[in-house]
C-alpha cells in the first residue's frame, strides 16, 4: 500500500494571529514556487488555538494546498471545563488533524496514556484525525528500553480504537531527547522504532491496518536531514517544530521528495 507522507508543522506556543497569517501566506507562496505536488506529500500546519481561524481564512480563501489542525483537544464534549476546547469546536473550525499526547503535554501537564486514549477517541468521534505522539526520554534510550517503552505507550493509546479507525490515523514517534535540542536520532534510530510501532499495530490488529497507518518521526527535523529520514521504509512523514516557523525551511521539508 502506498502511504502519502504527512509533513506537519507544530507551531507550539508561538506566533500571534497576525504573525500566523503572515507565515501561512509565505508558506503558500514558498510551496507554489517549489512546484509542490500534494500527491507526493501532505502539508499540514498545527497553530495555537487563537490562530486557527485566521489561518483557516487564508488557506480557504487563497485555496492553499495546506491542511490545518489543533495542538490539543478536551476529553469532554462540553460543560464547566474552563480553558478546555472541545472536538466539536475544532471540527466546526475545519480542523482536519489534532495532536494528542505530545511529549510536552505528557511532561508539563501530566497527561497519562489513559487520557491520551480518551482524547484520541474524541478526535475520531468528531470526524478528525488524531496524530498520536509517543517516544522515550534520554534515560530510557540509554537503558536500551526505547522500543519497549514506545510500543507500550502506543498499545495503551490505541486501546479500544477499532482497526478501521487506526488505519486512518497518524502516529508520531518523537524521541524526547531530540526535541528542540539540536540532537537528532539517526535515520536508522527512527526506522528502528517506527518499524517496531508498525509491528505492534500488526500484532494488535492485522497486517492491512499496519500497512495503512502513517508513522511520522519528530525530533529536530530540518531541510538538511529530512531526505535521509524519509528514505526509511517505515517513516511516513515528519512532525516538525522549530523549522516549521520559517516558511522557506518548512517548504523544503514538505518537498523533501525533490532532494
Swiss-Prot record:
A molecular function (GO) held by this record is:
triose-phosphate isomerase activity
InterPro entries, alphabetically? Aldolase_TIM, TIM_sf, TrioseP_Isoase_bac/euk, Triosephosphate_isomerase, Triosephosphate_isomerase_AS
Q: What is its EC number?
A: 5.3.1.1
The pathway that the record names for this protein is:
Carbohydrate biosynthesis; gluconeogenesis; Carbohydrate degradation; glycolysis; D-glyceraldehyde 3-phosphate from glycerone phosphate: step 1/1
Q: Where in the cell is it found?
A: Cytoplasm
Catalytic activity, as annotated? D-glyceraldehyde 3-phosphate = dihydroxyacetone phosphate
Instruction: List GO terms (cellular component aspect).
Output: cytosol
Gene3D superfamilies recorded for this chain? Aldolase class I
User: Where do the catalytic residues lie?
Assistant: 102 (electrophile), 174 (proton acceptor)
Q: What keywords sit in the KW lines?
A: Cytoplasm, Gluconeogenesis, Glycolysis, Isomerase
Where is substrate bound in this sequence?
10-12, 180, 220, 241-242
Disulfide connectivity for this sequence is none
Tell me, which GO biological process terms does this entry list?
A: gluconeogenesis; glyceraldehyde-3-phosphate biosynthetic process; glycerol catabolic process; glycolytic process
CDD domains per record? TIM
Fetch the PANTHER family from UniProt: TRIOSEPHOSPHATE ISOMERASE
Instruction: Tell me how this protein assembles.
Output: Homodimer.
Function statement: Involved in the gluconeogenesis. Catalyzes stereospecifically the conversion of dihydroxyacetone phosphate (DHAP) to D-glyceraldehyde-3-phosphate (G3P).
Tell me the protein family, please: Belongs to the triosephosphate isomerase family.
Q: What is this protein identified as? A: Triosephosphate isomerase
